[in-house]
A protein has these predicted regions:
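Glycine- and other small-residue-rich loops at beta-strand/loop junctions that grip anionic moieties
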Residues: 51, 97, 135, 161-165, ...
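Conserved, mostly hydrophobic/aromatic
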Residues: 3, 45, 66, 100, ...
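Structured beta-strand/loop patches that form or line metal/cofactor-binding pockets in enzymes
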Residues: 1-47, 332
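Glycine-rich, aromatic-flanked loop segments that form ligand/cofactor-binding clefts
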Residues: 101-137, 171
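Metal- or metallocofactor-binding catalytic centers and their adjacent structured scaffolds
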Residues: 9, 41-111, 330
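Metal-dependent enolase-superfamily TIM-barrel catalytic cores that perform enediolate-based chemistry
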Residues: 126-240
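Shared catalytic-loop signature of beta/alpha-barrel
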Residues: 217, 228-245, 250-356
Length: 360
């Protein structure tokens, strides 16, 4: 069976009307959402698919630097594919190579008439615990109402993006806890706190907020500081106010080793589309197990990405692969965020969470 084509397909989903989100640092307007699907075809009409980073740069990398290694080759076991390419091209190719690897594994599984999970030790979970992710910038009361709406679907936790200013960010947590009760987890994706120019929060403010929100039972505080400031992360984690999460902005495996080796985080986040594919995630999760850290899948794309991440997560015990991010969009429920219909149109038969659990 010969590989005939490798296509990084870039797709765009314009919103019917732009959506504007005012926040402490200014205003964010969303005009469209983009996506990438990688398609690999063989001469026997077998096709492998994978989600990829929605980036023209990554698409160019796949076309120019990865495709020449595949065209005309016999379909092969891709277990060493990413590692071999990194050896040849350097760490900068890790993300793109990993995304292509997923499509190769899809093909390899189909060719061998088995689930991809069989190549990673088999399933240890038949469902993956999801958290509902939405919460683009809005008023404190609107955040609370959205949290309640998302948790009506059975999710054990809700993630949102705080950036209303320190006082209103704290008020938001208080109102959300009142809205969802004591048993639902609250996850704060605080990447905006250090991206607001002169209005960015200082380390002292981040430390104050971490202590202040702790009493409300926060599941984790995600990327509250500039991602490369390892010393600041280690200091904040050592205060033991709340669990600190990060990882989505790491560009190679060394970055994850550094996060854990320098004791920067309690929870490591990554996804197959950006972090070395299925083999990369397997290595990251193994690292988490050895460092006694929790792993949580990060997702912010189409419905295809959580399914592929779930393949990987199902091969690990829940004690390690604890959470799967499941974005909530307004085309499913008008009470949340904004619409992204392309997400579901790509994989209309993809499994969806049932009472917060994604069945496989």
């Amino acid at each position: 069976m010969i590989i005939q084509s490798v296509e990084p397909l870039l797709l765009s989903c314009p919103l019917a009307e732009p959506v504007t989100f005012p926040f402490f640092g200014g205003c964010r307007t969303i005009f469209k959402r983009d996506a990438m699907v990688i398609r690999i075809t063989t001469n026997e009409d077998l096709v492998g698919y994978a989600p990829g980073p929605a980036s023209e740069e990554v698409a160019t990398t796949i076309i120019e630097k990865i495709t020449p290694f595949l065209l005309g080759e016999e379909l092969f076991n891709p277990e060493n594919f990413v590692e071999d390419l990194v050896d040849k091209k350097g760490d900068s190719i890790w993300s793109a190579a990993g995304a292509v690897e997923v499509a190769l594994y899809d093909l390899w599984g189909k060719a061998n008439k088995c689930s991809v999970t069989e190549f990673f030790g088999g399933r240890k979970q038949e469902t993956i615990c999801c958290y509902g992710s939405a919460g683009m910038y809005q008023s404190a009361q609107a955040y609370a109402e959205e949290a309640a709406a998302v948790c009506e679907l059975g999710f054990e936790a809700y993630k949102y993006r705080p950036a209303l200013g320190p006082e209103d960010d704290l008020k938001t947590v208080e109102l959300m806890r009142e809205a969802v009760g004591p048993d639902v987890g609250l996850c704060l994706d605080a990447h905006a706190w250090w991206r607001m120019g002169a209005k960015s929060y200082s380390s002292a403010i981040v430390e104050f907020l971490s202590e202040a929100i702790a009493m409300h039972g926060i599941t984790w505080l995600e990327e509250p500081l500039p991602v490369k400031d390892r010393d600041a992360y280690a200091k904040l984690k050592a205060m033991h106010y709340v669990n600190i999460a990060a990882g989505e902005h790491e560009h190679d495996f060394l970055g994850f080793r550094t996060l854990l080796g320098r004791d920067c985080v309690d929870i490591v986040q990554a996804d197959v589309s950006h972090h070395g594919g299925l083999s990369g995630i397997s290595k990251i999760i193994d690292l988490c197990e050895r460092r006694f850290a929790t792993f949580a899948f990060h997702n912010w794309g189409t419905a295809l990405a959580p399914v592929v991440d779930a393949w990987s997560g199902s091969c690990c015990p829940r004690e390690t692969a604890r959470w799967l991010e499941y974005p909530q969009y307004a085309h499913r429920d008008t009470r949340v965020m904004y619409p992204f219909p392309l997400s579901d149109e790509l994989v209309p038969e993809a499994p969806v969470p049932v009472k917060g659990e994604l069945p496989l």
